Amino acid sequence: MLETLNAIDSFVWGPPLLVLLVGTGIMLTIRLGLLQVLKLPQALKLIFCAKNDGHGDVNSFKALCTALTATVGTGNIVGVATAIKAGGPGALFWMWLAAFFGMATKYAECLLAVKYRTVDANGNISGGPMYYIQNGLGKQYKPLATMFCVFGIMCAYFGVGTFAQVNSIVEITKISAGIPVLYTGIALTILVAAVTIGGLKSIATVSSKVVPGMAVIYFLTTLGILIAFADQVPAAVALVIESAFTTTAAQGGFLGATVMLAMRSGVARGVFSNESGLGSAPIVAAAAKTNWPAEQGLVSMTGTFIDTIIICTMTGLSLIVTGVWNGELNGAAMTNSAFTSAFPAFGSWLLLVGLVLFAFTTILGWNYYGERCVEYLMGVKAILPYRIGFIILVACGPFLKLEEIWVMSDIVNGLMALPNLIALVALSGVVVAETKAYQQHLKEEAELVPVKLAEETNH
């Protein structure tokens, strides 16, 4: 089974998809004039200072936090560990590169989500790649939108949304606290059911309260590890850069890695972590209260910066400076070893709290993403059956194998990204035009011109 999945994964994440994924980010970076660098201060300011007086269901901050619930998850802890285990320290460099260009991609997809959003039968905002494919490219491209939704549901049901998160939670609770898998699975299922029944506003409320605090705590913990091993940090950074362009030899429990494997592992896990180009973040960005698509694009862009450039970097360097990356461990167990190396008395508990909160909120965010995909395909009546199915799969997650889960997640992530990337390339001219209009508005301090919501789409 694992060999078959690995073969499919190698095909899906082969050179064509890597070129399309990174190439789309490079193209958007050029067309937008290095926006992710020049406008980053403005974007960070907007997180807390956006006016939030336009159409939408939640404010920009809550929309960002909900997106971060799905991105800041096990990919930042377990995903980085598995990437380095498979591709060596050089995988971290390729995560950085993918994230840098991915910021432009995230900006573009979230801008388009607001521009082409619509209203569903319940009066709620609906948006995302399926809507900017259909309403931006034309209804003749609806099969592409359908393809995105099918793979989006697969991601939510069988990949990053449930199995990968649940499995990581039960693994770390068993390692750190000795709690049986069954008990953790039952408790997690009950908690997920309690929050998801409340829909987006319930998820957004939980996210806005949990995400900022947990991100700061995790950052400070990993910073403590780097301070404890400060003499190893320069060598670790040098190893990351060197390993990105040269084959890493086998050593200890590390089997060795080629440059291509480092690149594939880094980019694939980077997408798993920050979701730039995947098309998931635009689904919740569409619900933000804003009159300017570019404004929410800037806010959403910071998610990739926070997720990968900051959090994944701290995790990756912690694994390298402590020397656990080339040992026998993998996944959460590897990260746990790094934490206990620096903090023997309480390292496991710090990781336990961080990973459980990260993974739990990721489950909530992906429940919403899958819900919107189901609604697009089958209407609002299908939402409740979808939620029930999601909760059942959360209950099944603890009993699956870690290696198979991560490979399966990579596969469906790649398939989900494909239709979205095609749409981003085709609609890049719209992104540039909207960006220029917004920046000109800021210069002239003109009156806001609200974005008109499209009429409810009949599917």
What feature does the model see in each segment?
Residues 20-27, 31-44, 166-173, 180-241, ...:
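Membrane-interface loop-to-helix entry segments
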Residues 34-60, 82-84, 88-92, 104-140, ...:
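Flexible loop linkers connecting adjacent transmembrane helices
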